[in-house]
Regions:
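Cys/His-rich microdomains that often coordinate metals
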Residues: 21, 37-38, 126
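Short amphipathic, basic-aromatic surface patches that mediate peripheral association
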Residues: 68-76
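Residues immediately within or flanking Cys/His clusters that coordinate Zn2+
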Residues: 11, 30, 119
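Short cysteine-rich clusters marking metal-coordination/redox-active sites
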Residues: 14-17, 33, 122
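Cysteine-rich micro-motifs
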Residues: 27-37
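Short acidic/polar inter-strand loop motif in beta-rich domains
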Residues: 123-130
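Exposed aromatic-hydrophobic patches
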Residues: 67-68, 104-111
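Short Cys/His-rich "knuckle" micro-motifs
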Residues: 23-28, 41-44, 130
Length: 130
């Protein structure tokens, strides 16, 4: 999603405790957790099966249907998609997921709202987007 002056939303993770934050506006100040700067998450940089991690979405009218992977991602206790985020030209929507659920999310768009990006976060293989 583009924020002030075309800034892309960024995600950061703490290498100590695993906290993840979403930065929607960047004023150049580092994000700190556990006494150290957090590490920026980059989408799709982990060596993992692309066909199971990259989100795929369809839009029908005001309905957005997102699925993680052309081949659905496993949703096991030890390996699952934690969340799916839809970024639009007007806002950000997130669905939290748990093991055993399907790696899918449904969202509704408002008038004039357009999809910009869809992100998915795998507990083992990190951040992915389309």
């Amino acid at each position: 999603m583009q924020g002030e002056k075309g800034m892309e939303v960024r995600y950061y993770i703490c290498k100590h405790c695993g906290n993840i934050v979403e930065k929607v506006k960047d004023k150049g100040v580092p994000v700190i957790c556990c006494g150290e700067p957090m590490q920026e998450l980059k989408a799709g940089v982990t060596d993992a099966a692309v066909e199971k991690h990259v989100p795929v979405y369809t839009v029908e009218g005001s309905h957005v249907h997102a699925v993680v992977g052309e081949t659905k991602h496993p949703m096991l206790e030890e390996h699952f998609i934690e969340w799916i985020t839809l970024n639009t030209n007007q806002g950000i929507y997130r669905k939290q997921l748990n093991p055993g659920q399907e790696p899918v999310a449904d969202f509704c768009l408002c008038d004039g709202e357009q999809v910009e990006e869809v992100y998915a976060y795998c507990n083992l293989h990190g951040l992915w987007k389309c």
